[in-house]
From Swiss-Prot:
SUPFAM superfamilies assigned: Ribosomal protein L14 (SSF50193)
GO CC terms: cytosolic large ribosomal subunit
Keywords (A to Z) from UniProt: Ribonucleoprotein, Ribosomal protein, RNA-binding, rRNA-binding
Protein name: Large ribosomal subunit protein uL14
Family of the protein in this entry: Belongs to the universal ribosomal protein uL14 family.
UniProt xrefs under SMART domains: Ribosomal_L14
């Protein structure tokens, strides 16, 4: 569960290393985001010569959450850290590579480009 002020790792090669959620999109009173949801983030840490720089405000898709994700078959999946992938206004990833596993719940939320770039889908 991601809310305002939550720090997340960046799971792509856009140049950002750490971001902070500043808004959960999808309704005026919406408080939490989970896997596949789009959030607005501020870049808190970035590498030199990356595609983005510290202080930029962008959209991101949440790809990993530490909170349990319950599936229809009764199984539960969870990750060690919260992570997101930066996207542009056309909902395409800014980076060209995705690092680490992503859950298949992204497929239901129509983030097929992220699924295809990911090295492993759980």
């Amino acid at each position: 569960m991601i809310q305002m002020q939550t720090n997340l790792d960046v799971a792509d090669n856009s140049g950002a290393r750490r971001v902070m959620c500043i808004k959960v999109l999808g309704g005026s009173k919406r408080r939490y985001a989970t896997v596949g949801d789009i959030i607005v983030v501020s870049i808190k840490e970035a590498i030199p010569r990356g595609k983005v720089k510290k202080g930029d405000v962008m959209k991101a898709v949440v790809v990993r959450v530490a909170k349990d994700i319950r599936r229809a078959d009764g199984s539960v999946i969870r990750f060690d850290r919260n992570a997101a992938v930066l996207i542009n206004n056309q909902s395409e990833p800014v980076g060209t590579r995705i690092f680490g596993p992503v859950p298949r719940e992204l497929r239901a939320k129509n983030h097929m480009k992220i699924i295809s770039l990911a090295p492993e889908v759980l």
